[in-house]
Amino acid sequence: MESSADNTVPKQAESVFIREILENPLMPNLPPELAEIAKFVSFEGNVKPSIPVNWRLAESISALKAFEATFLNYLAHRKYGVRPSNVSINTDHATLFLMSPMLTQIEDRGEVRPFSPFDTLTAELFPNRDKHRANASLQRALITNIYKTKDGRFYHTHGGMNPEPTLQALGLPVEGEVQDTSEVVTDRIQQRLSKYDATHLDHLLNEEHRQAGTIVYSSAEYFASEHGQKNGKVGLYEVIRDPNSSQPAAWWPDHPNAPSSPKRPLAGLKVVDLTRAIAGPTITRSLAEMGASVMRVTSPDITDMSVLHQDLNWGKWNSWLRLDVESDRQKLRDLILDADVVVDSYRPGVMKRFGFGYDEVFNLVRDRSRGIIYVRENCYGWYGPWSHRSGWQQISDACCGISTSYGHAMGLEEPVTPALFNSDYCTGICGSTAVLDALVQRAEKGGSYRVDVSINYYNQWLVRSVGTYDEHTWTDLFRRHDAPVFRHYHSMQYMLPKLLTALYKFDGEILFQREFFGPFRSGALNTTFIQVRPIARFKDDAIELKYNVGTRGNGVDAPTWPADLRREIVRDEDEQGSGFRSGSGLGSGSIAD
């Protein structure tokens, strides 16, 4: 029987890290040296969990952060020949990683205040790229929710970044009424969905209208399904060597003004970021934190979640290209030809349609002296009948049984999607760690590599390897937070503020410690933000986690690699190699002194 001393969040996080990641039979190709390097990781933190959700979220994110830090130690050892560094993971600090967008503060006229996506300063710093007014009304916002169907099942609809196609597919008006309340709107949508059987609704939205949505399953139902069986054979990610690539073994080229070193292991690594939302941008932000130079590419013609840019655009230049224009496609090819990693998190098939799927990218670099890493991230996983579908964190949570279990844990006979962005952010860490894995493989074996990541892969692991709290721990956790009960029709916008209020009230001294936060300066915006610090703490800063450049909105930079990778803003003239000039804002993305 496990002793009470072992049943603490830090001890359980360590157990998950060792037994459920490093020794996981679904992760058979991990380097055997990781077992020894893992001994350099220590866990600390409060003995009890803080987030009133039955799933062991603190243990999950802490174990994944330990995995990422261990692989970074391994890469540094292989590339630079240095001894692994001691690293500590504070489980309370790691918990904040799952809610970091809501914790941002900003220095404004000498005062520090919470960052709000609704004030005028935010609009100046991060121009709104929500072209489809996704949350402009309750009608548009609440189409993303769980509703009951005609046959007594529950279904999670999702409006994505444009709710109109889903509303129109269901025969609902795209705008509500002026006097609408949340209750009125959820009742209106519920009445409409109660006319559909779940399977009919699933086909209507996904196959006929290509909109995100899923029947809400239990974990047992998911793993018994054809899709669950085909994807259930995958661990946290897959790294697959391109059989047609023959480039010799190689690291990335060293860069004169951003030399890679044990202290900044990924310095000089160039990453092309083709991502939106949360999971994909988390992959590239994590690589930037380790020293990589990231060029994010979006378009002035597509919508984006600007409310997340203060959190997820750190360490990235942000450029615009129109991929339906050949000259812009050539600019993207030029970026890729000088890069070592491409990350794609758009709906499966979108980038291939423009000529930038993994096969096309592998072929593009076939004649150069080194291969490339291509990361593709989706919701459902890359096998089975749902792999082509669009999806989001809430969809994956509902699909894999996370929502069903949480609702039952609160004493309900209905599913409830947990608040926070747990699955998204954790999937991002799986992706960044997989890139480290692939970089080492390329350095040892040569060639190009595809990395497959999905939110379902993470959630499968959460269900099978991490699990929920035992009855005693869950009862104590639930009651310590005044037993908060949410319903299936409660949206994220409703639950998140209530959850944060409870955390500040009951866990403030544990979670929101000053040492977990730091000032980050964006030279591009001439603004200082207070953000959650990097989670892994390497002893004596042997490995320094920070950002080379500050956050910003979309379209600020030219779509070209600058001659000086320390440039804060990339201008068109950088293509001619003008390099650094006075006032370019070196290193402004670092934690401010």
Swiss-Prot record:
Family membership: Belongs to the CoA-transferase III family.
Keyword Transferase appears in the UniProt entry: yes
Pathway: Secondary metabolite biosynthesis
Lineage of producing organism: Eukaryota, Fungi, Dikarya, Ascomycota, Pezizomycotina
Functional description taken from the UniProt entry: Acetyl-coenzyme A transferase; part of the gene cluster that mediates the biosynthesis of the indole diterpenes nodulisporic acids (NA). Nodulisporic acid A (NAA) and its chemically modified derivatives are of particular significance because of their highly potent insecticidal activity against blood-feeding arthropods and lack of observable adverse effects on mammals, in particular the tremogenicity associated with the paspaline-derived IDTs is not observed.
Gene Ontology MF term list: acyltransferase activity
Species of origin: Hypoxylon pulicicidum
UniProt protein name: Acetyl-coenzyme A transferase nodX
E.C. number: 2.-.-.-
PANTHER family linked: CAIB/BAIF FAMILY ENZYME (AFU_ORTHOLOGUE AFUA_1G05360)-RELATED, CAIB_BAIF FAMILY PROTEIN
Domain of life: Eukaryota
Positions of the UniProt region annotated as Disordered: 572-593
Keywords linked to the UniProt accession: Acyltransferase, Transferase
Pfam families: CoA_transf_3
Enzyme class: transferase
Sequence ranges of Gly residues compositional bias: 580-593
